[in-house]
Amino acid sequence: SNSNYHFDKNTVDGEGETFRVCGTFHGDWKEELKQVIKDSKPVTWATRGKKGERKDKFIEQEEYDLTSAGASADLEVSNFNRNCEKYTKINEIAEYFKLENFQKRIHVQTTGQVWNLHIDKLYQFNPEDPSKVVRITIMLNDWEPGQFYMYGNRMYERWKAGEIHIFDWPNTPHSTANTSYVPRVSLQLTGTRTEDTDAILNERDHYYSVE
């Protein structure tokens, strides 16, 4: 990996170093959420890409890391729902950030699913200038005890539905798990930042309303 992360578990990552919260959406998308959960399908490292995509060396590396640790290469990491356009309010959130060439994906992590520690490789979203690539996560339901998100060695927790965060994807190892009995649902957007995107993400305490 080309990561510049320190990988020292005794150096505690400070607030804002590995991830940053940047605003909140307010609205009621509970009805859409029920349908999103129902429509989601489990994925592994190998099946998380689009259908027909060949397995790349990064996926082989992740599977090797899993099996070396005694886990199955077919570990269910999350459920996915790729049909964001089907849900009006959630899609409104996705379109709000004015990203270019971007992917929308809803993650529904159910009880017992674990996304093992890894570093993202998102260079393909803008090969000419990967520094313009951003991954934005919007939590779609409230945090429950037993739901884990870790960036570097700092926990991200106690979020409310609608909270937005970004992280230093080329460098920060991160992982998630759900040991609660409630599906953890988040909207993940990955693409090229525009000036509008930056303006939105720099408004840290901003509240956005979804009708």
Language-model segment annotations:
Residues 49, 55, 104, 119, ...:
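Positively charged, low-complexity intrinsically disordered regions
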Residues 18, 133, 182-184:
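A general secondary-structure signal for short beta-strands and their flanking turns/coil
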Residues 142-211:
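Catalytic core of Fe(II)/2-oxoglutarate
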Residues 9-12, 125-127, 178:
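Short, flexible, solvent-exposed loop/turn segments with mixed acidic/basic and small polar residues
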Residues 1-100, 105-106:
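Non-heme Fe(II)/2-oxoglutarate
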Residues 91-168:
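Catalytic core of non-heme Fe(II) oxygenases with the double-stranded beta-helix
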